[in-house]
Amino acid sequence: KYDCNAFTTPCKELCASRLPQQNKCVPCMTHSLNKDDRIPSACEEDLAVWMAMMMMMYLTRQSVFMGNPVLVLAGSKTLEQLGMPKLLTQPGQTFDHDVLEIHHAVPVRRMRGFDQPEQKYELAHFTTQGWGAHYHVDMAEEEGQVVTFGRFNRQGTRMMVAVGHTLGCEFRPVYCSPAVYYEIEGGAREFRQALAKGGYGHHQAIIYGNHVKELQELGEIVGFEVEYFH
């Protein structure tokens, strides 16, 4: 209708307006559907992660997950809590090192590629009142899936990228879900510190595969710096 090729929305301000409560809706599924329809779509008006998402989607022809990065400290959560009981025989075991959690209610079904079969999904609700449709996708269905992380700085001149692999995926009954857990090359804690010191901000864009080299080449062509954390 509007011929748009990108989308974002002020999620927290939207909630404060009470319009979602009145209309019983949240923007989460819109973001998921947009991305699977090849339209970069970012939460919370975060244009720094939106730029990274756009570069990654256009470059690889794959859909992109995005979310809040949270440092999970060594020994603080069991493997069962990290959504990993199917992978190991001791679900009560804990990690002896830090891992990175990424959570948001905007998973996608075309992480493998726009020309590949869609991943399976199930519908869920965002609120405790049972409204606010979004869906869950098991982002740990392939053990050890290699992924690339990306985000631009606030000036839009530099992009930090990192590589990791998937450890587990936890579905939560409400709020931002799924929560996906990743091992980061170079260390999860060190990655978070590098993001803070570099002035990069918060959300991360995640794409299947190691695409660091292609992003570096794209940066040379388009004119932005790529900082590779590892």
Which residues does each PLM region occupy?
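A charged, amphipathic alpha-helical module
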Residues: K1-P20
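Short, glycine-/Ser/Thr-/acidic-enriched flexible segments
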Residues: K12-L14, L71-V72, P107
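Extended, charged helical/alpha-beta scaffold domains that provide interaction surfaces
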Residues: A16-L33
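Catalytic phosphate/nucleotide-handling subdomain of diverse soluble enzymes
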Residues: P40-L79
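Conserved anion/nucleotide-ligand pocket segment
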Residues: T78-P107
